[in-house]
Every structure is written in structure tokens, then in C-alpha cells.
Amino acid sequence: MKHSKLTSVRVAIVFATFLALFSVITLHAQKIGEIKRTVLTKQDLSVPGREGLLVMVEFAPGAREARHTHPGDLLAYLQEGTLSLSVEGTPTRTVNPGEAYFVPAEKVHWAECAEKTPCKLLVTFVVEKDKPLMSPAK
């Protein structure tokens, strides 16, 4: 009997450890994907080969973007939440509601929403036409 109780305890410990690790991995994976982008308008510009987009970006609490670039300039205005913004080559900064920021074309950057509240941004892109709006960083 002692042997089967010991085996049961070991199985329970292994199972609990697996479950805990799986939960952490799942939560981490979900944080990256909890970002909604809605294109509000897309318009050819007076500059040949360029287009402008106005995009609403919504982060779930704690969500973060993967490192990426855009084929043109980005201007953003944070309406709600607190965002941690990292632009390669510059110190990470905190963006608060009512603040705006700029990211130059092809500059690697990423952002993370604070854990407690969602983040909502209004983003204007001035980008090269017919290129993907976002590309993973190399």
C-alpha cells in the first residue's frame, strides 16, 4: 500500500507541475495575441506611392506586441490605459492617456499595456503603398 500511495503522490506532483507550466505558457502566448486593430480609413495621399491609414488599436490588460516595423512613419495618441513603449536605440518610456508619440519608418519597436486596464490608441500611418503594414523585426 505504501508503494501505491507514494506513486500516487508522485503522479499528482508531476501532473500539478505540468498544469502550472502549461498555464504560464498559455497565459504568455495569449498576452501577445490580445491586440485588436481596426482600420478606420485608408486613403491614397498626394505623395506618389504613399497612403495614409487611421487605425484604432486596442490592447487587453497586460497584452504586448512582438518586436516589429512599419514601412512608414507612425503617429499615435493614447486615449485610454498606460502603455510601455520600446523603440530600439532609445530608452523605454511610459505613455499615459492624452499623450502622443512618433515612431520613424522601419524602426524596430514594441509596446505593452499595463496589467490593470486596457489600452486604446488612435494611430496614423503614412506608409509605402502596397506593402504589408507591419513586419516582424529581424
Language-model segments: which ranges?
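Bacterial N-terminal signal peptides
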Residues: A12-V24
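Sec/Tat signal peptide C-region and signal peptidase I cleavage site
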Residues: V24-K31
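A short glycine-rich, His/Asp/Glu-containing loop-to-beta-strand
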Residues: I32-R67, T124
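Short acidic-glycine-tyrosine-enriched beta hairpin
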Residues: F59-A60, G89-E106
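Glycine- and acidic-residue-biased ligand/ion/polar-headgroup-sensing regions
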Residues: H70-G89, E99
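Ligand-binding loop in jelly-roll beta-barrel domains
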Residues: T92, E106-D130
